UniProtKB/Swiss-Prot annotation:
Amino acids binding ATP: 130-136
Species this protein is from: Mycobacterium bovis (strain ATCC BAA-935 / AF2122/97)
Main enzyme class: ligase
Protein name per UniProt: UDP-N-acetylmuramoylalanine--D-glutamate ligase
Gene Ontology terms for molecular function: ATP binding; UDP-N-acetylmuramoylalanine-D-glutamate ligase activity
Source organism phylogeny: Bacteria, Bacillati, Actinomycetota, Actinomycetes, Mycobacteriales
Subcellular location: Cytoplasm
């Protein structure tokens, strides 16, 4: 379809034919937003402070503007559509809010266009969020829907953007959404939504933990609300949900209205009186986190009528994504696991607790999160720790307090060489990769090579050398995938 209806439904207000819309951000999301707005007859102007990002838009004949100029002109726009990376504190968005100009994200735009019938009959949105496990759960959900014979598309923060899939013939959308996306999607009301867990994360973007939690809670405002009962924050959100149907899931035996585990099988007592879904042993994701992900996905799939057999088939054949508890190698009785996607302390704790004896490679950008509770919970599993990245001193401090007997090595590189150790970790326990890094090797690769070598020296047969960093990767790597690949390369080198 093309063109907005002349009589604009309330769900699209203030977006109408010819409406002046400021697109904040000229990168991939901004390109998709500008294309959709143009297609439906609005008048977009693209804002970015990088001229390189604006050039393709200008070549397509779209007006472009810098952030500072856009702030001065903000009252001339009916709407701002922001890319997820723009926080509310960004001067441009703060100016829009002060001027009373509505701010949507790309997900909000997609939701409203879909709800208005601009792409045909609206789809049913099944939305997954949480601090950890979103991608695995959403992928499992999509596999369950397909196994059940449903026309479903995987999208959101995984795969394709929602705006990019609305032309596809689908009845259901399996959507992974981050807190950034949800913050700018205030009207989202999914068919069913799940909050897996809530832990400190992205506090450099959200002003407070309360704001982060409130963003996550938006997925529980539709018809069916699903949340993890073993997580106190997620359970509290479920208690406050306005959804007509509220479903919890837990690792223990489920009560009526819940999914859980009984006799080593997943059981549904929410959408059936007492339905056995599948054996825990068939879940390919290791540890309790894999069981929780499968329970959440099953709850959403059951909410739209997917039968137990299809759920079991999907889980049995499911393959975990790269850099998510991925076994890289087993050598000399030591298992090397890449969980580079564990980018916050909550995820790292879940990862460590999946194994009995762990040499933990950790560190990076903590984004304001504390590790103390997590390190205390995992201390009994740790037989060694190798710390990397900008915020490694915070990890060292938590280990010193909660796991003082665990040997610790810090790997230092580049601009960090002037501060090689903390009080808790003496200079003798620091590896300076700047002294002998290989020609042409990136800092990240050199750091990981040293880290894996140190971890190998600590490990004994039966141990797991686990990359579960608890932090973001951008201080030394281009992303979590780059960090995971560096780990795999280093492992292959050390076991040769």
């Amino acid at each position: 379809m093309s063109g907005l209806p002349r009589s604009v439904p309330d769900v699209l207000d203030p977006l109408g034919p010819g409406a002046p819309v400021l697109v904040a951000g000229g990168r991939v999301t901004g390109q998709a937003v500008a294309a959709v707005l143009t297609r439906f007859g609005a008048t977009p102007t693209v804002c970015d402070d990088d001229p390189v990002m604006l050039r393709p838009h200008a070549e397509r004949g779209l007006p472009t503007v810098s952030s500072s100029d856009a702030v001065q002109q903000i009252t001339g726009y009916a709407l701002v559509v922001a890319s997820p990376g723009f926080s509310p504190a960004t001067p441009l968005l703060a100016a829009a809010a002060a001027a009373g100009v509505p701010i949507w994200g790309d997900v909000e735009l997609a939701w409203r266009l879909d709800a208005a019938g601009c792409y045909g009959p609206p789809r049913s949105w099944l939305v997954v969020t949480g601090t950890n496990g979103k991608t695995t759960t959403t992928s499992m959900l999509h596999a369950m829907l397909i196994a059940g014979g449903r026309r479903a598309v995987l999208c959101g923060n995984i795969g394709s953007a929602v705006l990019d899939v609305l032309d596809e013939p689908a009845e259901l959308l399996a959507v992974e959404l981050s807190s950034f996306q949800l913050h700018w999607a205030p009207s989202l009301r999914p068919e069913a939504g799940a909050v897996l867990n809530i832990a400190e994360d992205h506090l450099d973007w959200h002003a407070t933990m309360a704001e982060y939690t409130a963003a996550k809670a938006r997925v529980l405002t539709g018809g069916v609300a699903v949340a993890g009962l073993d997580d106190s924050r997620a359970a509290a959100l479920l208690d406050g949900s306005p959804a007509q149907v509220r479903v919890g899931f837990r690792l223990g035996e489920p009560a009526a209205g819940e999914l859980g585990v009984r006799d080593a099988h997943l059981v549904d007592r929410a959408f059936s009186d007492d339905l056995t879904l599948l054996p825990v042993a068939s879940i390919p994701v290791p540890g309790p986190v894999g069981v929780l992900d499968a329970l959440a996905a099953a709850a959403l799939a059951r909410s739209v009528g997917v039968p137990a057999g299809a759920i079991a088939d999907a889980v049995t054949s499911f393959r975990v994504g790269r850099h998510r508890a991925e076994v890289v190698a087993v050598a000399d009785g030591i298992t090397y696991v890449d969980d580079s996607k564990a980018t916050n302390p909550h995820a790292a704790r879940a990862s460590v607790l999946a194994y009995p004896r762990v040499v933990w490679i950790a560190g990076g950008l903590l984004k304001g999160a504390s590790l103390h509770a997590e390190v205390a919970a995992m201390a009994s599993r740790l037989v060694g720790a190798v710390l990397i990245g900008r915020d490694r001193a915070a990890v060292a401090e938590a280990l010193s307090r909660h796991a003082p007997d665990v040997p610790v090595v810090q790997v230092v590189a580049g601009e960090d060489t002037g501060m090689p150790a903390t009080v808790e970790v003496p200079v003798a326990c620091v590896l300076d990769v700047a002294k002998d890094d290989k020609a042409g090797e990136t800092v990240g690769a050199a750091v990981m090579t040293a880290a894996v070598a140190a971890a190998r020296r600590m490990a004994q047969p039966g141990d797991t050398v686990l990359l579960a960093p608890a932090g973001a990767s951008f201080d030394q790597f281009t992303g979590y995938a780059d960090r995971g690949e560096a780990f795999a390369t280093a492992v292959r080198a050390v076991i040769r």
